[in-house]
Amino acid sequence: MYSSRAAGGVLALLTGAALLAGTTPASAVAADFPAGDEGYHTYAEVTTELQKAAANHPDIAVLSSVGKSFEGRELNLVKISDNAAADEGEPEVLFTCNQHAREHLTTEMCLHIVQRFTDGYASDPNIRSLVDDHVIWVIPNVNPDGAEYDISGADYKYWRKNRRPVDGDKIGTDLNRNWGYKWGCCDGSSTRPASETYRGPSAFSEPETQAVSRFVDSRAAGGQQRIKTHIDFHTYSELVLWPFGHTEDDTGEGMTAEENARFRDVGQRMAATNGYKAQQSSDLYVTDGDVNDWMWGTHKILSFTFEMYPTGPFPGFYPPDEDIARETTRNDAAVDILIREAR
């Protein structure tokens, strides 16, 4: 989620090189992460792991797709439930990762959620209870094109946006400024295609946000949205954030005092388990067209952003792969809290 505005001088130095690297459209397929970080999973490796989870646990896990990226990659979707082949009307939870290309630790977070709830179902009573009483949806790669581009070659590119060309020679829209609720309303995104926070030519202009939003829309039945809670994982800063991002007001249009109090309560309880700081999104900086505002403003889904490890720019977006296990399991208790809030 981190914008160039908030990141300060470090990202300012990197932005020029990243934008220059993005002026020539190309579909990148990464063989692996840069040397030393091979413990991270490429898009192909994530897909293989998801296929294994579904094959090894066919009763509780189903792998499908919500659609395709600009370059044609499947936006993989995993459903986890005690009877995954059926639609039983249980409360649903959604986890999304990797809206921003360079935030690879988030993909590992979603993969960890899938593996934890499938591998642990038979032996862990807590996991079994959560799976039996809910439907858990996981989208590990919302922006696979950008992620693959970011790791193509020998070095990281600090790439944030997707890879659809815009305005002739520029590439990419910030997917987390492209959602339809209050899109472009409040000086929380950019109209400049060269900007890291470029919001796109219109709300939902990008195939990735179109696909995920269509899926969420499809979970509404009989006037009721089945998805009750949601986390969108980002890096970095170690924060738990809730709506609204487009306004600094705690309450007002679309948010009652009671609703805000629930966001605050759940956010603080989750933060108490992982040591993150809990706050309203706009307390960090104002954003418009972000996923949390859309989830809540459109569907009344209790939607949070987790800004994962680390707290600062070193190692910033690229923590070493030996940190993956520690920083993903760090969020286990918070994930469980969010699932239990789906009711």
Please annotate each region the language model reported.
Residues 1-30:
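Secretory targeting and sorting signals
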Residues 3-8, 32-36, 189-343:
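C-terminal accessory segments enriched in acidic
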Residues 8, 28-74:
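Short glycine- and acidic-rich boundary segments immediately preceding or forming the N-terminal edge
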Residues 29-33, 47, 51-55, 79, ...:
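Soluble secreted/lumenal catalytic domains
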Residues 43, 47-51, 110-114, 172, ...:
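Extracytoplasmic/secreted envelope proteins and their assembly/folding machinery
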Residues 58-62, 73-75, 89-93, 132-137, ...:
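Loop/turn elements at helix/coil->beta-strand transitions in domains of secreted/extracellular proteins
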Residues 77-87, 98:
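Short beta-strand-to-loop junctions in surface cap/lid or active-site-entrance loops
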Residues 90, 104-108, 112-251, 312:
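Active-site/substrate-binding loop(s) of hydrolase catalytic cores
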